[in-house]
C-alpha cells in the first residue's frame, strides 16, 4: 500500500510517495514530466540497477537523457557538479527541463543544487535509493556540495516537485549503507518522538531483515516528522536546527577522516552519542538515556565512539566552521529527553574537551 505525505510550503508544497514498485508507476509521475525534457542524474552503482527501469517509465513523457557520476561522498564537489551543467548545456536543455535525482544523498544534493542554479532554477524530482536519503536528505530542499574545508558549505534551499520512495530499492542496498540510514531514523526518535524511539527498540530484527511493513512505517514516520519540521521552518531559522542532532560532531568526523571513509550515517551515530554524553555532562539527561541511545545504535551495528585518531583539537577546528555557528559561538543540538532536543549556544569548551577526550 502506498503512503502519501504532504510537505506544506504554500505554492511550493509537494507530495512524498512511499511504497513498492513506484519506479514503474508512470501515472504518479505523469503530471510532473509530460512534454518535458528529462535529465536523470545517477551514479555508477545505481545505474546498472535502476537506470533502464526509470528510463522506460519516463520514455513516454518526453526526451530522456542521463549523466552518470562516480559513487561516493568524495565526489560531491564543484568539479562533478560541473559535469551536470555540461551535460545540460551540451544538449541544449532549457528552463522547461526536469532533473531527476536517482541515487542516494550525494546524488540528491548535487542534482538539487544543479537544478537550483541552472538557468536560475529548473524543476527536479527526487527518487532516493538509499535508506538515508529516503528518510532525510531527499525531503526538505537542502541542496549542496562539499568544500575541502567543510561539508555542505556551498548550496541552496531548493524544493523538489515530488519525492518517490520505492522501498524495493533497499533490497539491493549493502548492509553498511542500510545501517548508516538507520542512524538518521534513530535520530528522529531521539529529537522528536519518544514513542517512535521505543518502537525502533522493539523492531530491530524486523527492520534488519527488511520487513516491508516495518520499513514503510519507519520511513513514513521519519518523513512525517521532517515534513512537519520543514513546514514550520523551511530555511532553518528555528526548529529545523533540531534535525542536526549529532551532525556538528559528525561533520567534524567526516571532514577530518576524509569524505567517504566514514559514511555520513556512521558519523552521525558517533556524533549523536557524543551529543548525548555532552548533555549528560551538562545535567540535561541521565545515564539511562545515554545508555538507551548507545544500545540502539549498537543494535544496528553503528559506531558509538569517535575515531581514536581524533583529539579535541581535531574536532574543534571543524566545529568552529559549522553552519550553525553564530557570533563565533558553537551551537550544539543536544537531547533533553528521549523525544526532545534543544539548541545550546553556551556549551563550555572545557565540557566538550572532557567529553571528547573520554569518548
From Swiss-Prot:
One Gene Ontology cellular component: cytoplasm
Which cofactors does this gene product need?
Co(2+); Zn(2+); NAD(+)
- Indicate whether Nucleotide-binding appears among the record's keywords: yes
Q: Which family does it belong to?
A: Belongs to the sugar phosphate cyclases superfamily. Dehydroquinate synthase family.
Amino-acid positions noted as binding Zn(2+) in the UniProt annotation, renumbered to this chain: 184, 247, 264
**Which BP terms does GO give this entry?**
amino acid biosynthetic process; aromatic amino acid family biosynthetic process; chorismate biosynthetic process
Q: What is this protein called?
A: 3-dehydroquinate synthase
UniProt catalytic activity: 7-phospho-2-dehydro-3-deoxy-D-arabino-heptonate = 3-dehydroquinate + phosphate
Q: Which Pfam families match?
A: DHQ_synthase (PF01761), DHQS_C (PF24621)
Q: What does this protein do?
A: Catalyzes the conversion of 3-deoxy-D-arabino-heptulosonate 7-phosphate (DAHP) to dehydroquinate (DHQ).
Taxonomic lineage is:
Bacteria, Pseudomonadati, Pseudomonadota, Gammaproteobacteria, Alteromonadales
Transmembrane regions = none
Q: Which residues bind NAD(+)?
A: 71-76, 105-109, 129-130, 142, 151, 169-172
Per the annotation, which location comes first and is thus the protein's main one? Answer: cytoplasm
Quote the pathway field: Metabolic intermediate biosynthesis; chorismate biosynthesis; chorismate from D-erythrose 4-phosphate and phosphoenolpyruvate: step 2/7
Give the NCBIfam families listed for this entry: aroB
Is Nucleotide-binding set as a keyword in this record? Answer: yes
Protein species of origin: Shewanella sp. (strain MR-4)
Cofactor notes: Binds 1 divalent metal cation per subunit. Can use either Co(2+) or Zn(2+).
Q: Which PANTHER family match?
A: 3-DEHYDROQUINATE SYNTHASE, 3-DEHYDROQUINATE SYNTHASE, CHLOROPLASTIC
Going by the UniProt record, its keywords in alphabetical order are: Amino-acid biosynthesis, Aromatic amino acid biosynthesis, Cobalt, Cytoplasm, Lyase, Metal-binding, NAD, Nucleotide-binding, Zinc
GO MF annotations in UniProt: 3-dehydroquinate synthase activity; metal ion binding; nucleotide binding
Supply the EC number(s).
4.2.3.4
Amino acid at each position: 500500500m502506498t503512503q502519501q505525505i504532504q510537505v506544506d510550503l504554500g505554492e511550493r508544497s509537494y507530495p512524498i510517495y512511499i511504497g513498492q514498485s513506484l519506479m514503474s508507476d508512470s501515472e504518479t509521475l505523469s503530471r510532473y514530466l509530460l512534454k518535458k525534457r528529462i535529465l536523470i542524474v545517477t551514479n555508477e552503482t545505481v545505474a546498472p540497477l535502476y537506470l533502464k527501469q526509470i528510463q522506460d517509465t519516463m520514455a513516454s513523457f518526453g526526451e530522456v537523457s542521463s549523466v552518470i557520476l562516480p559513487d561516493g561522498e568524495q565526489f560531491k564537489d564543484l568539479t562533478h557538479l560541473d559535469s551536470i551543467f555540461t551535460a545540460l548545456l551540451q544538449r541544449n536543455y532549457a528552463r522547461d527541463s526536469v532533473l531527476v535525482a536517482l541515487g542516494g544523498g550525494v546524488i540528491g544534493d548535487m542534482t538539487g543544487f544543479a537544478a537550483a542554479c541552472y538557468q536560475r532554477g529548473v524543476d527536479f524530482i527526487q527518487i532516493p535509493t538509499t535508506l538515508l536519503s529516503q528518510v532525510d536528505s531527499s525531503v526538505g530542499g537542502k541542496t549542496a556540495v562539499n568544500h575541502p574545508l567543510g561539508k555542505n558549505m556551498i548550496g541552496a534551499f531548493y524544493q523538489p516537485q515530488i519525492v518517490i520512495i520505492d522501498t524495493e530499492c533497499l533490497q539491493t542496498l549493502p548492509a553498511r549503507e542500510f545501517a548508516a540510514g538507520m542512524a538518521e531514523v534513530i535520530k528522529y526518535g531521539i529529537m522528536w518522538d519518544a514513542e517512535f524511539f521505543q518502537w525502533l527498540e522493539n523492531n530491530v530484527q524486523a527492520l534488519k531483515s527488511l520487513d516491508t511493513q516495518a520499513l514503510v512505517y519507519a520511513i513514513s514516520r521519519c518523513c512525517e516528522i521532517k515534513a512537519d519540521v520543514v513546514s514550520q521552518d523551511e530555511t532553518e531559522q528555528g526548529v529545523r536546527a533540531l534535525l542536526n542532532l549529532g551532525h556538528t560532531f559528525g561533520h567534524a568526523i567526516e571532514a577530518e577522516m576524509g569524505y567517504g571513509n566514514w559514511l555520513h550515517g556512521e558519523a552521525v551515530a558517533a556524533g549523536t552519542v557524543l551529543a548525548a554524553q555532552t548533555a549528560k555532562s551538562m545535567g540535561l539527561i541521565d545515564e539511562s538515556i545515554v545508555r538507551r541511545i548507545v544500545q540502539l545504535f549498537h543494535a544496528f551495528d553503528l559506531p558509538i565512539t569517535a575515531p581514536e585518531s581524533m583529539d579535541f583539537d581535531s574536532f574543534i577546528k571543524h566545529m568552529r566552521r559549522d553552519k550553525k555557528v553564530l557570533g563565533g559561538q558553537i551551537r550544539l543540538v543536544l537531547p533533553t529527553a528521549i523525544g526532545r532536543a534543544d539548541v545550546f549556544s553556551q556549551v563550555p569548551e572545557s565540557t566538550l574537551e572532557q567529553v571528547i577526550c573520554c569518548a
